Amino acid sequence: SLYGATRRPTDEMLQDVEVLVYDIQDIGSRSYTYIYTMAYAMEAAAEKDIPFVVLDRPNPLGGNLVEGPMLKEEFKSFVGLYPIPYVYGLTCGELAKLFNQEFDINCDLQVIKMKCWNRDMQFDDTGLEWIPTSPHIPHGRTAMYYPATGIIGELRTIDIGVGYTLPFELIGQTWIDADELAKELNSRKLPGVHFRPMYYTPYYFVNEKEHLKGVQIHILDFDEFQPVKSQIHILAALKKLYHEQKLFNKSRNKMFDKVAGSTEIRTSIQNGISAQKIIDRWQDEKEEFEEEILEGEQASGN
């Protein structure tokens, strides 16, 4: 997130501004907040009749991966402002057009397109240098791990590698049996991923200096890997194997639901609903988004 006294430009900030330019690298997941900083800035620009220019940048997950549940209206917040899938398959410029047209911002928007980019490119395919977008997104590949564990991390009951050298690449806790969890997750035969038993000690954050056991997530095929699907299976496996443990934290449930976009994931896991049934519930909305939004961008040659 961008931190400061306000989340949107004030009238004073925009005094004498002739054009407002957005040039920030995003990571392709709904709860990563730069896209809402962009939306708030677009709203402020619209109010002041200031042209808004987006210098488009690659979505590090590529331009075809759409996955996860849609955000429900009542869960709007700074970690999810609009009803889009958790992994949305659009660049920041494409999102700006979506926000402007579908959600009635109506600013004077211009998107400067990228050269040489195509939708099949993940970040490593672009040849660009990755500049960390925040301290816990040190590599372009981290953007693919973020939607695989980031929602779980909001619980604060499961460590996801933040505070260690592998942010978003781990699942750990003192009460996990590393071999057991790895065996369970690998038995689910999730596409493009392997889970390795892992033992580690975070340097800081919630589980600082605790000896944790769990799994390291190894993405074997970044084209086949489905991060949100994998995250739901991780939650379901933890609930199945360690049902006596406190997986959900009442003080963090509200934040978990905001990031997840509704109460559905949390309550379904709590009630023992299978991972596949949870995933099946969002398929119709996801496919509708792909047909209406993503295919429109593909047809326009973006």
Indicate residue ranges for each PLM-predicted region:
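Short acidic catalytic loops
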Residues: 19-27, 53-56
